Amino acid sequence: MKEKGRLLKDSFIIGATGLSLNLVGLWFNIYLSGTLGTEGIGLFQLIASAYMLATTFATSGINLSVTRVVAEALSLPETRKTATRRFRKCLAVSAALGGFACLLLFVFSGVIARSVLCRPETEMCFRILAFGLPFMSAGSCLNGFFVAERKAYKTAIANGTEEICKIVFAVLVFALHPPTSLVSGCVGLVLGLVGGEAVSCILAYAFWLADEKTLPRSKGGTAGTVRKMLAIGAPVAASSYLRTGLTTVENLSVPVGLVRYGMTDSDALAAFGAVKSLAVPVIFFPASFMYAFIKVMIPEVARAYTLGKTDAIRERGGHIIRLTLVFSSIVTGIFLVFYAPLGALLFDNAETGKLLLYLAPLIPAMYVDGVADGILKGMDEQVAVMRYNIYEAIIRLVVVFTLIPVLGFAGFMATVYAGNVINTSFSLARLRRKAGIKTEPFGSVVLPTCLTVAAGFLFKSVFSFWQSRFSVIVEVFITAVLCAAVYAFFLFPKLREKIRASSPRQNARNRVRRNIL
């Protein structure tokens, strides 16, 4: 019971922080759409896509490998006292990797701007972004340590500080020097991004210095730490390098394909920016609490895997997958019903709200893919995850080159669907094969979606008299709470028993039995 309480507490901390940060981030994206326009956001997304290659090189595999190395060291009595020294080695490797990535990006920023983006004016953005890589690499390592140490609140505070600082710095830059062009706006954004990374890393390092004084120390051997770190992180890194490379090519090719279809360059950038920076963040916004469970459960699955507790993996993993599918299906139903008023409320544009409708059926696959990958990584199945990510990236790239020039925006949507469905299918099949975790599509996806759609239309008609753009908030809230309560009643037997036990009829029966006795 104490263990479950701790897990729920950690999940709540990370989830509440993630929800708050996503809300702030969503506001910031909407603010940017008004400041730079969707075309400016699209240009920044292209810069970010190219920048992903450098961030992947600087951080890929670090967080997971540090979490695994430290969690395994802390779980065994004979290695517990060496956890701090093992982490120091991991931090040194991370810092070196981040510094090298910084040097590479700074030197080749001009080549990337001219030859990759074909926009020489963006060179300054890459030069500024290079200085954020060492902070990003070290911060990823430090956050991995906090997760392994079961101190989720420190990761939450560091990440929260980072996101808030990014936004505050960018808004200050725009206030002091209003953007006069798309590129000047992007420069303001990257300045905020680098500033946020630096503050977050410094804060996380201060947390670690305080923790180091309380952890047990030993002069025991730590040989093999770097080798183990590389063994865990290398497959993830290799997958990320290849997948990020393919994803970068895909993202850079989408506007090109839309132009070939017949769109203007401005319209193509605007469409790309609307999907990546407006619709997708809204789609993933409700998942904050769900992804909190992933971060907390990875070290738990790693410990269970280390100790050979396959039943625990199957029970916990199956429960998480089932909850994820039900939760994502409720979200799907809400977007299917309320896409238009949500678009008008969030973007002041019902047409942009249609993007929520187009992406809504894909939400269960989007959500459960991240959960399944997290469980598999905890079971030392990162090589399989690597393969599936590569398969997805290749398929998406093929669809980009073949369908977008022919179908335009519909081809863009086909790209998103094809990759997510295939990757999720592979991951769930692997979980079933390795851990016996099964899924029930009808009970976990179809029924909750239909229930939510029915409830949504019901409350939409009930509140039809309320002609306000904010009425959708009440309608969505009531629909979500009702559907979640109904499914919680069926999914949690203990909760169902408590409700029945506290009912007036059951209380009357209990009194009669006591009187008879």
Feature names for model-found ranges:
Residues 60-75, 283-308:
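Helix-loop junctions and terminal segments of transmembrane helices
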Residues 1-24, 85-88, 220-243, 311, ...:
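N-terminal membrane topogenesis motif
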Residues 460-517:
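Membrane-proximal transmembrane or re-entrant/amphipathic helices at the cytosolic face
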Residues 21, 25, 29, 60-67, ...:
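Short runs within selected transmembrane alpha-helices of multi-pass transporters and secretion channels
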Residues 98-245:
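Hydrophobic transmembrane helix module of multi-pass membrane transport proteins
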